[in-house]
Design a protein with these regions (language model features):
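Conserved GTP-binding G-domain of TRAFAC-class P-loop NTPases and closely related GTPase folds
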Residues: 4-8, 103-150
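Conserved phosphate-donor/acceptor-positioning beta-strand/loop module used by diverse small-molecule
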Residues: 90-104
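Active-site flanking loop/helix segments enriched in acidic
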Residues: 151-183, 211-220
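Divalent metal-dependent catalytic cores for phosphoryl transfer on phosphate-bearing substrates
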Residues: 182, 186-292
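Acidic, metal-coordinating catalytic cores used for nucleic-acid/nucleotide bond scission
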Residues: 71-81
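Conserved substrate/cofactor phosphate-moiety recognition/catalytic segment
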Residues: 17-67
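Conserved glycine(s) of the Walker
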Residues: 14
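Pre-Walker A (Motif I) flank of P-loop NTPase domains
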Residues: 1-5, 66-67
Length: 297
């Protein structure tokens, strides 16, 4: 039976270098290669729908011919991953690149055809770890393990940028104060470590997603933090001591605040983790200062 390997990783994470080690036994289908062949530019992003429709068809055809296939692309969209996997009948392996974004940015600058820091930061906002997607095996690959840090290191992000939430009346407290309040409450109530870690780090992505524009591009007075949970999840995932249960909570913690949560919850295989999300939401809401102005000391 044929074997299919899908890489997941942002630009500069070493996907292609790692995949090329297996070129003797697999047909490597590269999105960059297809872009250059079809449109003459590996950085072309204007034909993505057409491009991936062609790529997915070619992958399915190769597997139907009983050939082993490696799909080398960022593959950050869970929806697109699931769509392709549902059409493939073979052993399916995910290789997800566990490389800190700072390292990816540095590696990208060394490349002849750099995508740029802004593109990489946008990619992180779409990151999602492949829970319940149909893979038979998930391998975490870190070719730059010397740059990995324990998760506690990421608390230093609070000193790298303006800490104010700028979204009164929902938060008068700072971002770091909110996370500290959540963590303190979890420790006091003797929550398990996986849960306390999520409480401590769930909003670290806000330091990289703050904007004063809504999704329509209209300027707003209150700060927005669209997709911060995905950035938080990526930052935690690239720590050397990450675990998938904490990652699941961080990645999905905003779902309980939004419509459609119960419909999503019913589809999950691990209902204990879904209940963790429900409980997490209570901490997230309770550990805010919403009635009086908060002054930084």
């Amino acid at each position: 039976m044929a074997e299919f390997i899908m890489y997941i990783g942002i630009s500069g994470s070493g996907k292609s270098t790692h995949a090329n080690q297996y070129k003797d036994n697999y047909v490597i289908v590269s999105s960059d290669g297809y872009r250059e062949k079809l449109y003459g530019d590996i950085n072309d992003q204007t034909h993505n729908n057409e491009l991936f429709s062609i790529i997915h068809k070619d992958i399915i055809d190769l597997i139907n011919e009983d050939k082993n296939v490696i799909f080398d692309a960022t593959n950050l969209s869970s929806k697109h991953r699931v769509s392709l996997l549902s059409k493939i009948k073979c052993r399916k392996i995910c290789r997800i690149m566990q490389v800190p974004f700072e390292v990816c940015i540095a590696k990208d600058k060394e490349r002849e055809r750099s995508v740029g820091e802004s593109v990489i930061m946008k990619q992180i906002r779409h990151f999602s770890y492949p829970f319940d997607e149909g893979f038979d095996e998930i391998e975490v690959i870190n070719p730059y393990s010397q740059y990995s840090f324990p998760y506690s290191y990421f608390s230093t992000y609070s000193g790298k940028d303006e800490d104010n939430h700028y979204c009164e009346p929902y938060h008068y407290e700072t971002i770091s104060h909110h996370c500290a309040l959540c963590k303190k409450s979890g420790v006091e109530k003797k929550e398990p470590l996986k849960f306390v870690e999520a409480l401590a780090l769930h909003d670290v992505g806000k330091y990289f997603t703050r904007s004063f524009f809504n999704r329509k591009g209209e300027k707003v007075e209150r700060a927005t933090y669209y997709d911060h949970q995905n950035v938080s999840a990526y930052i935690y995932f690239t720590s050397k001591d990450f675990n998938t249960e904490t990652l699941f909570i961080i990645q999905n913690h905003m779902r309980a605040h939004l419509d459609g949560f119960e419909k999503w919850a019913k589809k999950q295989s691990n209902q204990d983790l879904v209940n963790d999300i429900r409980r997490f939401c209570l901490y997230d809401r309770a550990c805010r200062i919403i009635e009086v102005n908060y002054e930084r000391v």
